[in-house]
Amino acid sequence: MIVENHALWGEEPTEDYPATFTYLGAEPLPDKPNGRRPAVIICGGGAFTHIAPHEQDPVAFAFLDHGYQAFVLNYVTSSTGDVSFPHPQADLAKMVATVRANADEWHVDPKRVCVVGFSAGGMIC
């Protein structure tokens, strides 16, 4: 399994752009064109004050077990920045664009990117 942590909006998270994400991936599929897998972006809940850990990695591992490349988005919360519209939604839009832009490196089918969200995370989807 591959695990990588990244800043969403640049090299390092900043006060203005605190969002991060974790890529949890598997090796390319030998029986698929270019070894590409579908991708899922996971947005945990937490009332926009935090992100509940039990709605992140366990969900990612379940999707990995079903053949997906998983991305756990740590969107902006009130403890990290401004949660007013459109900041969390902009984080998700950037995440979708980032997954598609890095499809070759992460062995993702850019036409098969989905999003799952829980509670506050579902509100930004």
Residue ranges and their predicted role:
Residues 47-55, 72-87:
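Cap/lid segment of the alpha/beta-hydrolase catalytic domain
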Residues 86, 97-119:
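Gly/Ser-rich "nucleophile elbow"/oxyanion-hole loop immediately N-terminal to the catalytic nucleophile
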Residues 124-125:
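Hydrolases whose catalytic domains are alpha/beta-hydrolase-1, hotdog thioesterase
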Residues 36-45:
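Short beta-strand element of the alpha/beta-hydrolase
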Residues 37-38, 66-68, 110-112:
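Loop/turn elements at helix/coil->beta-strand transitions in domains of secreted/extracellular proteins
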Residues 61, 93, 97-100:
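Core alpha-helical elements of the protein kinase catalytic domain
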Residues 1-35:
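N-terminal cap/lid segment of alpha/beta-hydrolase-fold proteins
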Residues 53-71:
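Short amphipathic alpha-helix adjacent to the substrate-entry channel of hydrolases
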